[in-house]
């Protein structure tokens, strides 16, 4: 009987992890879709309270993304990679190809709030030949 409960517990935990992973991917995809429509108000809604506090308005946030993260603003291709946990935060790794064909590895730091998963920051690295 102990083995049965252990198996059920593992299944429940795995199911929760899969649901969280799907929710995280949905948030990132939805924000990218909003950027593609230049809908910075909607894109801003997917940012954490910390990020919203840093930029104050959707317009300022949109300008930052357009100028600092053009591969996110206008990606040619988006591929979700692994999900990791680091320092209590969930990290979703994403490979993005920009309009010029250059590959970038992005680490989306996600936090879970009362509103659901939100983006708390993005770290970008140009992908080398080994990551393509």
Regions found by a protein language model. Give the residues of each.
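Sec/Tat signal peptide C-region and signal peptidase I cleavage site
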Residues: 15-20
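Short solvent-exposed beta->alpha transition segments
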Residues: 22-26, 30, 40-87
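Positively charged n-region of N-terminal signal peptides that target proteins for export
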Residues: 1-4
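Residue-level detector of flexible, active-site-proximal loop/helix-junction positions
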Residues: 11, 50, 126
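Hydrophobic helical h-region of N-terminal Sec-dependent signal peptides
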Residues: 6-10, 14
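Exposed beta-sheet edge and beta->alpha loop/turn motif
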Residues: 82-132
